Regions:
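N-terminal topogenic module of multi-pass integral membrane proteins
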Residues: 1-74, 183-187
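Membrane-proximal helix-loop-helix units in multi-pass membrane proteins
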Residues: 92-138
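Small-residue-rich transmembrane alpha-helices that serve as helix-helix interface/gating elements
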Residues: 162-177
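Core segments of transmembrane alpha-helices
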Residues: 28-35, 85-93, 141-146
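Structural signature of hydrophobic alpha-helical transmembrane segments
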Residues: 45-60, 100-116, 164-168
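Hydrophobic alpha-helical transmembrane segments in multi-pass integral membrane proteins
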Residues: 92-101, 146-161
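Membrane-helix boundary elements
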Residues: 67-68, 72-73, 81-104
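Cytoplasmic-side transmembrane-helix entry/capping segments in multi-pass membrane proteins
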Residues: 76-88, 110, 133-142
Length: 187
């Protein structure tokens, strides 16, 4: 016999976790924009620069997610969305780091899976916020991630670095907007 969970308490716990960890979204925005700068500056280095840069980004992003999941975690254990996203990030970073000379198509698959799963998890988190601060921005970030994944898989060989840079620019800005909304809602 399981324990009954009040959906209202789940929403409140998730909202509080995001509000107290608003810095995690700001860090994710900084990381995304830092990779955009690297991709734009080192554009002509191609896949040789993209592979280690993405691996470092995936590890750093996963670390930010894991810290947010553990730090000030809700007592009812509702951090599984953040933990899952972090584990997917660590796996993507490890896959790329272990094989730095991955063929471009393999890198497309790793990036697409990482971004797609992260987008779906953002959408799942957003549906649980039930009209609270940041829900619309979180939905937008999730949709951008899912649409980027679809575009990436639809045309895997079409300008990976530029498409990734554009996606990360939008995703980074949305994370800053989300951090700002969550921080403002704490007052």
């Amino acid at each position: 016999m399981g324990v009954a969970i009040d959906p209202g308490n789940v929403v409140v716990a998730l909202r509080r976790q995001f509000e107290t960890n608003w810095q995690m979204f700001a860090v994710r925005g900084v990381l995304a924009l830092a990779l955009v700068v690297v991709l734009v500056i080192r554009f002509y280095s191609g896949i040789r620069m993209l592979t280690p840069s993405f691996a470092l980004y995936a590890f750093a992003d996963a670390a930010a997610l894991m810290i947010a999941a553990i730090w000030r975690a809700p007592p009812n254990g509702r951090a599984w969305l953040l933990v899952t996203d972090a584990l997917v990030g660590f796996a993507a970073g490890a896959a790329v780091f272990a094989r730095p000379l991955l063929p471009e198509f393999s890198l497309v698959i790793v990036i697409g899976v990482r971004v797609g799963i992260g987008g779906v998890l953002l959408l799942m988190s957003a549906t649980r916020l039930d009209g609270h601060a940041g829900q619309r921005v979180m939905v937008a970030a999730g949709m951008v991630s899912v649409l980027f994944t679809a575009a990436l898989f639809a045309a895997p060989h079409a300008g990976l670095s530029w498409r990734l840079a554009i996606y990360l620019l939008v995703f980074g800005c949305l994370n800053f907007a989300l951090a700002w909304q969550l921080r403002s809602s704490r007052r």
